Amino acid sequence: MNTSRWLLMLTLAVVLALGLAACGGDQATQAPATQAPAATEAPAATQPPAQASSPDAQAAREKGLTFLADAYDGKYKGTVVTMTGPFTDEDAVKFNNSVKEFEEKTGIDIQYEGSKQFEASISVRVDAGDAPDIVDFPQPGLLGNFVKAGKVVDLNTFMSEDWLKQNYKQSWLDMATMEGPDGPMMAGVWQRFNGKSLVWYPKAKFEEAGYEIPQTWDELMALTQQIADDGDTAWCIGIESGAATGWPATDWIEDIMLRTTSLENYDKWTRGELKFESPEVKNAAELMAQIWFNDDYVYGGRASIVSTFFGDAPTPMFEDPPKCWLHRQGNFITSFFPEGVEAGKDYDFFYFPPIDAEYGKPFLVAGDIMAMFNDRPEVRAVMEFFSTGESVKAWLAAGGALSPHNDASLDWYGDDVERGIAELVQQADAVRFDGSDLMPGAVGAGSFWKGMTDWIAGAIDLDTALKEIDAAWPQE
């Protein structure tokens, strides 16, 4: 092969090799381009980001209230939660106003049906398998019957225990814990309450007379005697209430029981495990009688107590000069005060004082516990909402309710009186529900009322009254 041909062939080989290399280079640089959509997932990257949780949802999630958080994020928008309870008229309006903002933020429609025959109607509905999603019980004893029958959802199955302990005094949780078919369970959450351990007095006249607020039972008795020595009767008392005559007397017994025996004994008493004939209950009645049965201490004397309508009992306190100076009753009684009297000027209140220092400063209450009968996510969300002070905030501003929630600010109250009562309850060593409302109806709304009325009227002695009350307790 001559040199020229060899050079030509070599040149062609080099050119061909370079051409192949160039083709290979094109493939190498194109490969990432053909894989780019998969490697960078461009379509996903260009999608709009998920909507951020609202501040309300974030706050709920931080508290462990996951269903409430989801509700604020709109997850249950368009759903309906049915409720029933005793709220009618003005109370129904206040309740609906208190949940209105929640409904607007979540899109959940809370349909509340109030009934003046609530106790009878709810039993019919539950027995017929037509229970609403949530029921508002003013009487925990009635709720306890449904819990025992296995009709109520245990809130411990979904609600944060840490949150409940953070937002309620232990006493509220104790009162919401009831015996179910499989043992103790969290039967509901407390949403609002009324305070009972209160003594009302005509503030301006009281101060003008030089009287001082008693801090103990002994000081209360000394004040009572001081007023008697001044020629007046200290106490305004009346227990007439139609078919319910006698109930104000049961409140006195309950308040004194809380101050003279243990919470365990009080709870046993409400369950029928501590008899009315026991020394503990008899002692409470005898302490009450020190005031009630002394004609120098009670306006109109003992004989007037049974015939005086409970709502009229405090009226003489506002005469000039007052015909009586002290009236023990719950915060609802202000609605019976004469028109035009001014809180903080014409009247005020003080805490019904402790008796035995061993039992501290307990507080007697009545109120509403919300229980869940149907288990769906949106119902769980509403129940978690009821465990927050926000659920009753609008009601506090409007007046007529107190909040059991630790996260409810005292600044939310539109009434100085109710704010002061709420503060007392926050400071209380323990809280217990009205005992007669925890007892079976035959006792709490029957023999207890009648026994106290007959004893106060002088128709029977104390031992007979206590024995007759015990005899009415249902035998299982």
Annotate the PLM regions.
Residues 269-270, 364, 396-408, 419-476:
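C-terminal capping/gating helix-and-loop segments adjacent to ligand/active sites or protein-protein/ligand interfaces
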Residues 97-171, 175, 204-215, 316-318, ...:
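Extracytoplasmic "Venus flytrap"/periplasmic binding protein-like
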Residues 51-77, 141-197, 221, 227, ...:
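Hinge/lid segment of periplasmic solute-binding proteins
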Residues 100, 104-105, 128, 184, ...:
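Extracytoplasmic/periplasmic substrate-recognition and gating elements
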Residues 77-88, 108-113, 134, 187, ...:
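Short, well-ordered beta-strand elements
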Residues 140-151, 156, 171-218, 239-269, ...:
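Periplasmic solute-binding protein
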Residues 70-75, 156-171, 239, 258-283, ...:
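Short, solvent-exposed loop/beta-turn-alpha elements that line the ligand-binding surface or hinge
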Residues 224-226, 270-306:
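Glycine-centered hinge/linker elements that transmit conformational signals in sensory
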